[in-house]
């Protein structure tokens, strides 16, 4: 780290002493005001709330932080709250797609560094947002892994291969399922008034249990092959507030709905939708 800073000093990109510490304080203030306790000064309440919720979900539930330096760099240069929301939307898309695509930490650093390079080169904040998914600097064009964001079929393939996996719940140490469910839940809010906080303990629950009792209705209605195929898929997962209840997790359908979902869904939009749908289709054929 010392060697890296010495390079920055020697080529004039940083100055030692008070100037350096002022720069640190400036970035610290941006980090606090736009990431830790985000405030967005724009008239559009829904858009401002979207930034607050999305930045919170990313900071708390993405298991990496390489997306943060580009956001700090963008705001430090342009100080535009309105466009910062648009920037974060695209930044989150990039972070999620490349996480699904299996980028390593080194590959993420290289990928997000390209955005910082673009910010350094551009004096137009809208230009940065328009080009941030496709930009590669001339010297880096042949270096590092790149996803072509202009090819819809490439993006759809990444999404399909990830979201439809039968072991989806277990991906990335079980972190991806929680993040994707929270993102889907966020999109179900109108964000005009009360906004989701997602500050309590968030649990991912299986509707069809992972380990149903041999004499349960789950075993009667789903053979082993079907259970293996569906139990860890995205469509079998819902969000709950609070810690897991291992006993309730294996209850039969009606009791599970009453004891588990109906008491713990209040902070989420999608869980009651799943509950209502399942109650409406509670038959031998559809359950």
Spans of features found by a protein language model:
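Betabetaalpha-Me/HNH-type nuclease active-site subdomain
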Residues: 133-271
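Conserved small/polar residues in nucleotide/adenosyl-binding loops
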Residues: 276-283
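A cross-family structural signal marking well-folded subdomains
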Residues: 1-178
